[in-house]
C-alpha cells in the first residue's frame, strides 16, 4: 500500500468523523442556546464532506483503493468521540470544547500525513486541506472564547 493510499484512508476516516461531529453539534446548537453558531458548524460539516470526496476521487484517479469505510487505526483514534457525549447535554461551551478536541485531532492527522512520502499532487491537496482545517479549528476556538 502506498503512502498516499494509507494517508488517504486515515484522512477520509477523520474527515467523516468531523463531518458527523460538526453536523451533530450544529443540530444541538440550532435547538439550544446558540442557534447562530449552527450555520458555522453546518458549513464546516459540509467542508469535511467535500474534503473527503476530494481525497477519495484523487485516490481513485491514482489507482489507489481508498476504502471508504476507513481504517482500524483511525477508528481507534476518533477525535470526535467526545462530541458524541457532549451533544447529549445542553451546554454550548461543552459542545464547542468537544469540537475543538476533534479539530485538534484532525490537525494532528493532517500533520502525520504530511510527514509521509506523498506524491506531489496528493501532498498539494493535503497541504491545502490542512490549512483549511487549522483555520476551522481557530474559528471554533474563537466561538468558544465568546461563550
What kind of region is each of these model predictions?
Residues 95, 99-147:
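Preference for long, well-ordered alpha-helical segments
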Residues 19, 26, 52, 59, ...:
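A structural signal for well-ordered alpha-helices, especially hydrophobic packing surfaces
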Residues 3-14, 33-53, 92-96, 121-135:
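Alpha-helical scaffold segments that form or flank carboxylate-/histidine-based iron centers
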Residues 20-25, 46-49, 72-80:
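Short, functional N-terminal and low-complexity linear motifs
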Residues 2-32, 94-117:
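Alpha-helical bundle segments that constitute or directly flank the non-heme di-iron/ferroxidase center
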Residues 36-73, 140-143:
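Conserved alpha-helical segments that form or flank metal/cofactor-binding pockets of metalloenzymes
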Residues 57-97, 101-107:
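Carboxylate-rich helix-loop segments that flank metal/cofactor sites and access channels
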